[in-house]
C-alpha cells in the first residue's frame, strides 16, 4: 500500500521506541493499528462506493438507452397508426363513392323510360294452354242410342 520495506519499518520502530519510550509504545501501537484499520475500512468503503456509482452509471446509461428505444418505438407505432388510419379513411371514401355510384345505377334502372308490358295473370295462361286430355271416365264407349 505505501511501498515500505522491512528495513524501513525497523528504523521507524526503533525511532518510536526511543521517542515514545517502552511504557507507552504498546498503547501507541494499538492506537496506530486502530487508526490504520479505520483508514483501510474507509478506503474499502470509498472503493465500493465508486464501484456502486460506476454500476449505477452503467444502469442509468442502459435505462436511458431503453427509454430512447421505447420513445422511438412509440413514434414508429404512431406513424404506422396514422398511415393505417389514412389508408382506412381513403378506402372508406372510395367504398362510399362506389356505393353511391351503384345506388345511382340501381335507382336509374328501377325507373325505366318505357313501362314494361303487363305480365299475364294465372287465368290468362289457362285460356292459352291446350285443353287437358280426356280422363279415362270420359273414354267410355258410346251406347247404342246414338244412331
From Swiss-Prot:
Membrane topology: Single-pass membrane protein
Record's keyword terms, sorted: Cell inner membrane, Cell membrane, Membrane, Protein transport, Translocation, Transmembrane, Transmembrane helix, Transport
Ranges of biased composition (kind: Basic and acidic residues): 93-103
Residue ranges of the TM segments: 1-21
Domain of life: Bacteria
Gene Ontology biological process terms from the UniProt entry: protein transport by the Tat complex
Comp. bias (Low complexity): 109-120, 129-147
A Gene Ontology molecular function term of the record: protein transmembrane transporter activity
Subcellular location: Cell inner membrane
Predominant place of localization: membrane
Family: Belongs to the TatB family.
HAMAP family, per the entry: TatB
Name of this chain's protein: Sec-independent protein translocase protein TatB
Organism: Bordetella pertussis (strain Tohama I / ATCC BAA-589 / NCTC 13251)
Gene: tatB
Amino acid at each position: 500500500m505505501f511501498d515500505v520495506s522491512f528495513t524501513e519499518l525497523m528504523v521507524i520502530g526503533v525511532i518510536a521506541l526511543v521517542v515514545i519510550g517502552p511504557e507507552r509504545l504498546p498503547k501507541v501501537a494499538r492506537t496506530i493499528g486502530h487508526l490504520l484499520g479505520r483508514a483501510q475500512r474507509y478506503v474499502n468503503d470509498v472503493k465500493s462506493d465508486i464501484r456502486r456509482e460506476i454500476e449505477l452509471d452503467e444502469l442509468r446509461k442502459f435505462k436511458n438507452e431503453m427509454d430512447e428505444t421505447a420513445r422511438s418505438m412509440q413514434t414508429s407505432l404512431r406513424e404506422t397508426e396514422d398511415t393505417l388510419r389514412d389508408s382506412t379513411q381513403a378506402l372508406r371514401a372510395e367504398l362510399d363513392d362506389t356505393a353511391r355510384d351503384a345506388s345511382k345505377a340501381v335507382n336509374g334502372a328501377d325507373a325505366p323510360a318505357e313501362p314494361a308490358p303487363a305480365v299475364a295473370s294465372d287465368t290468362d295462361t289457362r285460356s292459352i294452354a291446350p285443353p287437358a286430355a280426356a280422363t279415362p271416365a270420359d273414354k267410355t264407349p258410346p251406347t247404342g242410342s246414338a244412331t
